[in-house]
Amino acid sequence: MSHADLARTIEAAWEDRADVTAATQGPVREAVEAALALLDSGQVRVAEKSGNADWQVNQWLKKAVLLSFRLTDMELISGAPGGAAWWDKVPSKFDGWDAERFRQAGFRAVPGAIVRRSAFIAPGAVLMPSFVNLGAHVGEGTMVDTWATVGSCAQIGKNCHISGGAGIGGVLEPLQANPVIIEDNCFIGARAEVAEGVIVGEGSVLSMGVYLGASTKIVDRATGEVVYGRVPPYSVVVSGSLPGKALPDGAPGPALYCAVIVKRVDAGTRAKTGINELLRD
């Protein structure tokens, strides 16, 4: 079945998703399973750059991921600590893998790394004890550090570092229209959070503890410009605050969180300069 045929079948099933159950067989199940296999192998991805460098979201692939939950019953999944089991609908990406299969895949997955089937991990990536949800895409040479999470259908570019405890939001809960996208060569600081379809432009640095959602004000300190939902390429971003509105009695209101672009760097500077130096004011 061609990708166009898969998309048509999945779009039609999505419109009638209330009728899709674990008992559903035939073209709908076949199309969803084929789409998940394509995602798992990296042949397709939920979002990709179009010719004008904007990101195009392949909504049919996201819908295939969502439909897969309706098509699958809960089952025991072995491998939990102490000989216990998990109870879930989505098997591990590594289920049935042997040493040769890992060699072919070309990435490292240290003990404690969890990747759900239909996520793609590119060669050269390193997964510390972390969690990568279904439909996600992790690019070549990227490290997902300890206790970091990459949400469903999130797109992580090449040579990124997702630091310890950082969270990259998914599209499943709460349901989002578009995935989070971290472009190539980005550094996401420890315990930072990027959610609600935010795009972090190539070469950007997010300091520790920066939180970005669709409604977060992103303030360029040099110009005063405020943007939402997208960090421009090669931005260095830290946490900040904006003055709040005055209270009814005239007293100063509470300051409100924002993210602040403290500087922009070119590709050469970004490549040569240590992260700590970039974050110094």
UniProtKB/Swiss-Prot annotation:
SUPFAM superfamilies: Trimeric LpxA-like enzymes (SSF51161). CDD domains: LbH_THP_succinylT. It is an enzyme of class 2 (transferase). GO terms for molecular function: 2,3,4,5-tetrahydropyridine-2,6-dicarboxylate N-succinyltransferase activity; nucleotidyltransferase activity. InterPro entries: DapD_Trfase_Hexpep_rpt_fam (IPR005664), Hexapep (IPR001451), THP_succinylTrfase_dom1 (IPR023180), THP_succinylTrfase_N_sf (IPR037133), Trimer_LpxA-like_sf (IPR011004). Its main location: cytoplasm. GO terms for cellular component: cytoplasm. Pfam families: Hexapep (PF00132), Hexapep_2 (PF14602), THDPS_N_2 (PF14805). Its EC number is 2.3.1.117. It catalyses: (S)-2,3,4,5-tetrahydrodipicolinate + succinyl-CoA + H2O = (S)-2-succinylamino-6-oxoheptanedioate + CoA. Pathway: Amino-acid biosynthesis; L-lysine biosynthesis via DAP pathway; LL-2,6-diaminopimelate from (S)-tetrahydrodipicolinate (succinylase route): step 1/3. It is found in: Cytoplasm. Keywords: Acyltransferase, Amino-acid biosynthesis, Cytoplasm, Diaminopimelate biosynthesis, Lysine biosynthesis, Repeat, Transferase. Gene3D superfamilies: Hexapeptide repeat proteins, Tetrahydrodipicolinate-N-succinyltransferase, N-terminal domain. GO terms for biological process: diaminopimelate biosynthetic process; lysine biosynthetic process via diaminopimelate. NCBIfam families: dapD (TIGR00965), PRK11830.1 (NF008808). Belongs to the transferase hexapeptide repeat family. This is 2,3,4,5-tetrahydropyridine-2,6-dicarboxylate N-succinyltransferase. It comes from Methylobacterium sp. (strain 4-46).
